[in-house]
């Protein structure tokens, strides 16, 4: 052990005690030991005696095992080792569907290994039930969700994933949520403009631009085996909670956002900062909608008075002055609808444009309960507008104003919506029954049918295969004897292949009527014979009464004589058809037209059946 001492020094008029300082050097860390002597000095004359009072106090410092600056490297090593261990355990616990393709495993290894994305989840969308089909099931088979550390990490991960897909699978990914420099500059200008407007309105928007730029969501279509990859920042993932959307029905409860209130969203930050502004709170209190009604008892009668006169300015004033609860708003719209119904029933000419704008202006979409009461009301109102002026509120307007609007707002279309459109198509009158006008109508129907794909009726059948829907569809394909769509025969064949022996009487009658309308008697008889039962007697449930009426109403003597002379009516006795009074009258009328009234055939078909 080496010892180094500092010698004491003397000063004038100061009594100093020897203060030895000793520094000990060892092989380990160095420590400082000191023996401190307290000194009192005087400013009196030279002759004054020096009064010295020595109070010695020893203080020792407890040595640390390892200084902080020597622990930095060790802590970093432990942190790196912990990350490696977590990464290995995460790879071991990585769950991928068993029947998934090898490409999904390669993409998962890239995301969790090289790119360092966390919280990796894979949802298999192939096993979804038909009742819970969404747009995602139509697009892909596997949905991947993972978390990035920042927006730059999201962008870098997308670039690396795109390079990997090009190299491994010769596929270029499609991404949503990636902003280029021009879009980012445009976004910043909008945020700056929004912040300026917020300052004028007394709102605080200090953190809005910063918060929006610090969160990201990249949705990537790999275009490989139906794989979609979602890369999100942690806060954005907590806000969106995509896991609950993609999870199966029996596992959605596992991903419900229970602690979502603790996540500080962007809107929440702005709301907290704005609530601290007292003036803003007073302004919001003054501008908020009242949740009580101030309408007088005669309000509805006054509204009806203005609507009957078509004074829409006065009607608007009454509705705005009485705006209250959601139930009251629905009741007001019902009153408007009933007034229009009375005017249309009286065949009065109404201003359809003003009536439509009045209903749209006071329509709201606030809650699920209100939407459930609103859409049937809007459907009835649209039918009344079409009845009042089919040229203005045509089938094309109904498609955009009702069907597309309802679908875009997340509401489910129902059977009555499609029937209403088909009835409007049939009511639309053109100046001439040309083939091109019929094609235009058919295009509207095709666009509407695309909206109803995958929708089921109460009987677990497709809405498109409903009996009334099929009847209206067939009627829309025929204008007259000369004008018909070329797809009519293909549609009839498709109906026979789809239903087979389960064809209903309504479908058969609709097919017969449309074939009789175009006077294709050979196809009509071919269809009628194709549905003849073969299992034995007593099984013939074909609509004989409607079949005979269609033949008789044609007035074609050649067709009628062919039906009678070729023995088609004899199948009534052979298959023991239940001859009702209506069928008896139809047989008599047909034989009378054929000139065989009171004949042996009539007695055999009608009277012989009555004797049984």
Curated annotation (Swiss-Prot):
It is a peripheral membrane protein. Residues 1-14 form a transit peptide. It comes from the Eukaryota. GO terms for cellular component: mitochondrial inner membrane. One of its GO terms (biological process) is mitochondrial gene expression. It is found in: Mitochondrion inner membrane. Keywords: Membrane, Mitochondrion, Mitochondrion inner membrane, Transit peptide. mRNA stabilization factor specific for the 0.95 kb OLI1 mRNA. Also involved in OLI1 ring formation. Belongs to the ATP25 family. This is ATPase synthesis protein 25, mitochondrial. It comes from Saccharomyces cerevisiae (strain RM11-1a) (Baker's yeast). The gene is ATP25.
């Amino acid at each position: 052990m080496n010892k180094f001492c500092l010698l004491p020094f003397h000063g004038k008029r100061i009594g100093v005690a020897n203060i030895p300082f000793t520094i000990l050097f060892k092989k380990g860390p160095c420590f400082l030991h000191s023996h401190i002597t307290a000194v009192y000095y005087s400013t009196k004359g030279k002759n004054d005696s020096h009064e010295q009072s020595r109070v010695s106090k020893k203080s020792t410092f407890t040595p640390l095992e390892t200084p902080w600056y020597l622990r930095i490297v060790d802590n970093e090593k432990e942190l790196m080792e912990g990350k490696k261990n977590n990464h290995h355990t995460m790879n071991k616990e990585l769950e991928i569907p068993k029947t998934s393709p090898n490409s999904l495993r390669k993409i998962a290894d890239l995301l969790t290994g090289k790119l360092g994305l966390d919280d990796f989840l894979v949802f298999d969308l192939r096993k979804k039930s038909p009742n819970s089909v969404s747009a995602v099931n139509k697009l892909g088979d596997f949905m991947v969700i993972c978390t990035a550390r920042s927006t730059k990490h999201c962008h870098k991960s997308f670039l690396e994933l795109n390079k990997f897909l090009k190299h491994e699978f010769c596929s270029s990914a499609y991404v949503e949520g990636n902003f280029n420099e021009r879009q980012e500059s445009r976004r910043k200008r909008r945020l700056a403009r929004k912040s300026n407007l917020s300052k004028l309105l007394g709102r605080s928007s200090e953190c809005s631009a910063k918060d929006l730029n610090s969160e990201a969501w990249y949705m990537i279509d790999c275009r490989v085996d139906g794989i979609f990859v979602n890369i999100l920042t942690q806060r954005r993932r907590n806000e969106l909670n995509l896991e609950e959307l993609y999870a199966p029905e029996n596992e959605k409860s596992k991903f419900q956002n229970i602690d979502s209130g603790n996540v500080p969203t962007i809107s929440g930050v702005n709301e907290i900062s704005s609530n601290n502004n007292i003036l803003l709170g007073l302004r919001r209190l003054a501008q908020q909608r009242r949740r009580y009604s101030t309408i007088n008892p005669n309000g509805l009668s006054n509204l009806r008075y203005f609507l009957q006169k078509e004074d829409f300015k006065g009607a608007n004033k009454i509705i705005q002055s009485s705006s209250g609860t959601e139930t009251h708003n629905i009741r007001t719209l019902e009153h408007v609808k009933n007034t229009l119904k009375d005017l249309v029933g009286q065949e009065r000419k109404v201003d359809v444009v003003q009536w439509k704008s009045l209903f749209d202006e006071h329509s709201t979409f606030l809650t699920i309960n209100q939407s459930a009461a609103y859409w049937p009301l809007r459907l009835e109102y649209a039918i009344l507008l079409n009845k009042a002026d089919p040229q203005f509120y045509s089938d094309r307007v109904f498609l955009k104003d009702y069907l597309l609007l309802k679908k875009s707002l997340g509401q489910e279309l129902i059977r009555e919506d499609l029937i209403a459109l088909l009835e409007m198509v049939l009511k639309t009158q053109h100046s001439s029954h040309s083939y091109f006008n019929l094609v235009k109508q058919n295009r509207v129907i095709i666009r509407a049918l695309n909206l109803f794909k995958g929708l089921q009726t109460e009987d677990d059948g497709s809405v498109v295969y409903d009996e009334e829907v099929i009847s209206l569809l067939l009627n829309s394909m025929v204008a007259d004897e000369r004008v018909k769509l070329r797809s009519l025969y293909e549609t009839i064949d498709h109906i026979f292949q789809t239903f087979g022996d389960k064809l209903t009487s309504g479908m058969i009658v609709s097919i017969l009527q449309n074939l009789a309308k175009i006077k294709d008697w050979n196809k009509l008889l071919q269809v009628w014979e194709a549905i003849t039962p073969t299992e034995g007697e007593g099984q013939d449930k074909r609509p004989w009464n409607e079949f005979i009426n269609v033949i008789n109403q044609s007035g074609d003597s050649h067709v009628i004589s062919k039906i009678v002379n070729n023995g088609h009516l004899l199948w009534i006795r052979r298959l023991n058809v239940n001859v009702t009074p209506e069928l008896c009258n139809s047989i008599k009328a047909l034989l009378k037209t054929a000139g065989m009234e009171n004949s042996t055939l009539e007695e055999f078909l009608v009277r012989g059946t009555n004797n049984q």
